[in-house]
Structures are given as C-alpha cells and as structure tokens.
C-alpha cells in the first residue's frame, strides 16, 4: 500500500483544482494507493506545506511514500520537512511539484525531488497573445466559435472555454534533454559546474 498526500495550492484556485483533479484521477485508477491527506494552502506558501508535511510525518511515523504538490514552492516546503527527518530523497519519498523553479530542478538533479511539471513559457505566451488578439478583433463573436477550444471547464461560476498548452514531466532521466537542451536553465545553473 502506498500512502500519498496532496499539497494543494490556494483554495478555489482553478489551477490548484485542475492539478488536484488530475491527481485524483490517477488515484481512483489505482485502488492500491491510499490518499491520507488532501490539504489546501492559502497563498501557496512553502512554510505551510512544510508544516503540513511535518504533521503527517509525525502522524504516520515517517511512513509517507509520496507527496504531490501543486507548485514548486510547496514542494520545497515538503522537501525541507523531509530533509529534517533524513527522508529528502526521491528513492525514499516521491515528491513532485509544478512550475520547474530553479531550486526544484536542482533538487531533481540531486535526487531530492522525483519530478517537476514544466509549463513551457513560449507556447503559453504565444497562445495567450493569439487568444487576446482574436478576442479583441472580434468582440461580438462567441469565443467558442473563434478559438480552437480543447475543452470547457467550469470554474464554479461559469463554463470557461479552455485551450490546453503542453506540459512536460521533468525527472532525472530527461532533465538534460528538456530543461537544459531547450535553454530554460543552463547546465551550470542546474548542476553548478
């Protein structure tokens, strides 16, 4: 049995909800995985994620197999709590974050963190600009007919046409061929040499 924790971002944030929904789909498809905590963290703060992790480590006698975080900062908080218990190793506790902050990519390279989700900036920016220009040039038309919408997501108030941009799961195996090869960070920044 694998004991997992989800460290969620800001309560009600659509990104936190979308990321967490994806994690839940995986958990539901794998009944041998047990979710022991699902905690939102106001402000996406690393220190709150660290405190949550410290409490869970105490409650479960340091027997946590994985922690999935909605952003890199909270993953750093989790790793700080794990480090204090000698558990900051992807071989001991699987930790994943999202944002690919430099420190987290360094943790992936060092083996402290298992994976980061990298949202490529160029496709995000290009899609945002194309969408904004199209909407500005056609203010009286329905966005769903103008844009290549991948799906509609209800944000709790309205249905939002959504364009999905690619993300990359970065781990030790593909770190050099993704983050470094595409120039997001340099070899020097990641490895310090």
Enumerate the language-model features and the residues they cover.
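A residue-level marker of the well-folded mature domains of exported/periplasmic proteins
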Residues: 4-193
